[in-house]
């Protein structure tokens, strides 16, 4: 029976007062009954637009129809025919600007909760079946994948399904890329990422950690050792700073480092020996999802006050509305239309405050957003002992600098053609290494496209 309710079926969540001090997952997921209730909101459009908004082309109406029937296994099989990582995308994909943005139900009310349903199906399968994929017979061709984040994992999975012998190289000691070092446990439990890595290994993908391509091995050496193509999905891990006075003080760090220490190296665990600054009052500079993650981690690590300092207004914040909402519920204070101009230190070289100036919005800039302009004489002090810079990241130049013929743009992003091939024949790339910091699902889409292009390239030789 169709469910004509104008709003989504609510997702159970941890109480904000409780979750603000723990790292357990915030969103608890649908029950089977709730999933079926939400699936029944789908109108079964003859010409569904939702699929057009999905970077990995999930057959959304088909999987939702199976959820309506209670056939969750079939729903999972439909999703994974094009999306290798539904438990991940169902949690961190910005559906509100993609598939759900095109849902007809959104015209008069809220769209169908496609992301929540995808997550439910993936979780149900993992908890009730969790069958490992079968290894496909080898076609005798070797491909290297550099980086084990969403782009690399997707490319490796698709290539393995085609019969390629795939080796995935990860620079850190744990595979998963940004999924393990960047996204906190309370948004994406690491056990889920580990399960996806296990599935890749079941497909025959060899996962090699502590392998920094460009230092331990170069791209040229990969080709010399028999790999016929290389996919570079090494992400964008080089943080940007403001270059204001005081950035070298103790207590200032990038969100990239802060989240890596907290998430990958488990600084939140009292048994871990990972050093991380546990502040009483912290400021996170920036307004994206990474800024929200850093601010929410700061609160969980014991801070009494955490501020998000952003130079534009709240309406211009790039962070997902859901992440902003969760941050506010947990006690994070937003300081919008403000910009730091100096970080103040004490006699020991430690942060003791941040001098800011108020901003106003002028005419739109090249990004289409109104340009922030300083308001003269509006300086004020923010009493903080920690400052986390979350201003975006660029790709690390290591691979480019050690690979002849590999060209990048002015931001250090690899230049690729319409088939994801770089300026070096046989080297393909996708994800943040090409686009700069973007979304998990766009990286997954690039991984799919890169795998298909590598297959065509090798077959054409």
Go through each PLM region and give its residues.
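Ferredoxin-type iron-sulfur electron-transfer modules in oxidoreductases and energy-metabolism complexes
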Residues: 19-37, 59-91, 108-137, 262-263
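A conserved FAD-binding loop/helix module that cradles the flavin
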Residues: 433-460
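Glycine-rich dinucleotide-binding loop and its adjacent helix/turn
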Residues: 121-137, 195-215, 239-301, 408-419, ...
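Local cysteine-cluster metal-coordination motifs and their immediate loop/turn environment
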Residues: 40-62, 86-107
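N-terminal Rossmann-like FAD-binding beta1-loop-alpha1 element of flavoenzymes
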Residues: 141-167, 291-299
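FAD-site-proximal beta/loop scaffold in flavoenzymes
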Residues: 248-279, 364-437
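Feature captures the FAD/FMN-dependent oxidoreductase FAD-binding
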Residues: 74, 137, 142-146, 194-244, ...
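Rossmann-like dinucleotide-binding cores of NAD(P)H-dependent redox enzymes
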Residues: 168, 172-203, 207, 295-342
